[in-house]
């Protein structure tokens, strides 16, 4: 029973995504998101109860940058107000104390108030923090209740996102 070092996942929104196995990490290869300034400061202040220091809009989500990790960790967003924002969700981030950056991701319009670890959000976060910190390889933490650690790398028009995974199912498909 040989394990594959590389395989392809077909995604409805991102096309074919290449997955590489490197040691105990799974590395996913995503298209990089492009950020534009967003002017919804008042609406995001109402949702979060804190004013972001920077606010952007990506392909699917709004990215709010906060002053520090403690603010990100202690947020209690108003999910009913967040549902009214015309995007999939809200990514909140700050520079990390023991990593490059931290984040939390809220998607109540999809039925998920807070996603525990969000690979797709890091296609938005990685270009922002890579530019801000002046480095291509980044170490990130998502501060949801379950939490997670991600390894991110900006590579031209792509973002490589890696993390550890636990096998929860095994089987065979017969065609």
Regions from the language model: what does each represent?
Residues 1-175:
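Active-site proximal loop and beta-alpha junction motif in alpha/beta enzyme cores
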């Amino acid at each position: 029973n040989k394990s594959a070092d590389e395989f392809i996942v077909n995604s409805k929104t991102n096309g074919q995504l290449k997955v590489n196995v490197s040691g105990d990490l799974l590395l996913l290869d995503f298209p990089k998101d492009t950020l534009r300034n967003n002017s919804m400061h008042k609406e995001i202040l109402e949702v979060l109860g804190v004013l972001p220091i920077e606010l952007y809009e990506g392909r699917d989500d709004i990215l709010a940058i906060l002053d520090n990790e403690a603010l990100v960790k202690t947020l209690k967003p108003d999910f009913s107000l967040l549902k009214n924002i015309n995007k999939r969700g809200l990514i909140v981030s700050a520079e990390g104390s023991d990593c490059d950056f931290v984040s939390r991701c809220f998607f109540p319009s999809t039925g998920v108030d807070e996603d525990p670890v969000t690979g797709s959000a890091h296609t938005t976060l990685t270009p922002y923090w890579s530019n801000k910190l002046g480095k291509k390889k980044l170490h990130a933490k998502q501060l949801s209740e379950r939490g997670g650690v991600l390894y991110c790398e900006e590579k031209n028009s792509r973002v490589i996102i890696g993390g550890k995974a636990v096998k929860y199912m095994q089987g065979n498909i017969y065609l």
